[in-house]
């Protein structure tokens, strides 16, 4: 009933039930995208230790960020209940040293939690030592005029921002390099439309999530690859021919694939004919 009539809240509940499981969280994020449910980056002043719904949007939880977890998220929320964080200095002044260290703040910056403070992410990270030094003496001074000047830096490239997000979430939450690849290769098929191409050859651009290798009866190596684009997932099948041709595919790569769409146990898969690695 909840899934049919209140899909937004249903997905929020599933996401909250998956906190601590990167794999399940990623799966539910893909479900949200397939169902046009918007999930936005966490906010240091709006997010909680759980996922919440606001303005028909799921706001990602602080707890689901790598190296943050529930305890630190709750500590941030507890401090915020005394008043919203005014800026990065106010945040560091109020939470730094209370189980929250420099690495935690770096992760929060890379996750996009501090974007609302008006500085780009590279500027925040490059000034972090300055900010922390101030936080260690600022409570004694109580004088805003003594705050150091922020030195501005050009923002990370779009690809660097995406990689940083991947590092802190384990998946792409806001931007996805697959989108950039599709702009360069207009004949790419979206995975959520793969059912329209059954028994046909297609070109897809995917992120390699995991690789499972097996041996055939003849002792040859073949593999099954779990892959994804911005919206959906699919299984790729690589037969021994690829290993004889010295094709090497690694987890975490983005690849262009040409292959035939087949169906096995009611699930679509692609039997791969050609593979090309994409450097981003």
Which residues make up each language-model segment?
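Noncatalytic, beta-rich nucleic-acid-contacting surfaces in large DNA/RNA-processing enzymes
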Residues: 1-280
